[in-house]
């Protein structure tokens, strides 16, 4: 569609469904802002050069894991009402992850076990009774930080 685009910014109003599809060999940055709670993002794009992804909105049921869409992303900032549908498996180079849950419901489970290169994780939301699954090979400083965060919030850290 736009063969030379490096930065993509989409802002949607009025409950629209946004679809990111196709393949991009030049895209490096993606920002999707859905202003209405009824809007959703269906992400099935293949964009291996993307390094930074910022998504504010709900994920559609047909979305692929973000690691399949953006396998080389180094930074993900996700703000959503359905955080349990955020799947970062496959983001091989992910170093920074920020997840923000916009509801007051319990999150459930977040699986970070495949993301061994993570150096920074920030999870905001109702973490009580949330299970955060991490890798045994994860950065030790990050594990210590996650232990403190999860303990304060009433979440459970599980090593795999």
Which functions belong to the PLM regions below?
Residues 1, 12, 23, 41, ...:
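Small-residue (G/S/T/A) turn/hinge positions that recur once per unit in extracellular repeat modules
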Residues 1-10, 110:
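Low-complexity/repetitive intrinsically disordered segments
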Residues 2, 21-24, 44-47, 66-70, ...:
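Hydrophobic anchor residues at the C-terminal helix/turn of individual leucine-rich repeat
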Residues 5, 15, 27-30, 50-52, ...:
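Conserved hydrophobic position(s) of the canonical leucine-rich repeat
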Residues 11, 21, 33-35, 56, ...:
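Feature marks extracellular polysaccharide-active and adherence modules
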Residues 16-20, 24, 107-160:
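Leucine-rich solenoid repeat scaffolds
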Residues 18-20, 41-44, 53, 62-65, ...:
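Canonical leucine-rich repeat
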Residues 31-36, 43-46, 53, 57, ...:
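The feature captures the LRR N-terminal capping module
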């Amino acid at each position: 569609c736009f063969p030379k685009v490096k930065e993509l910014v989409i802002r949607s109003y009025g409950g629209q469904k946004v679809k990111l599809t196709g393949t991009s060999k030049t895209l490096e940055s993606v920002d999707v802002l859905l202003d209405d709670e009824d809007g959703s993002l269906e992400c099935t794009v293949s964009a291996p050069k993307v390094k930074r992804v910022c998504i504010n909105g709900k994920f559609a049921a047909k979305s692929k894991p973000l690691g399949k869409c953006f396998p080389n992303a180094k930074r993900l900032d996700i703000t959503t009402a359905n955080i349990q549908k955020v799947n970062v498996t496959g983001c091989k180079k992910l170093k920074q992850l920020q997840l923000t849950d916009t509801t007051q419901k319990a999150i459930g489970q977040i699986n970070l076990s495949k993301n061994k290169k993570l150096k920074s994780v920030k999870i905001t939301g109702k973490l009580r009774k949330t299970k955060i699954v991490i890798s045994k090979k994860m950065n030790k400083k990050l594990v210590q930080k996650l232990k403190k965060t999860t303990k304060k919030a009433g979440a459970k850290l599980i090593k795999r």
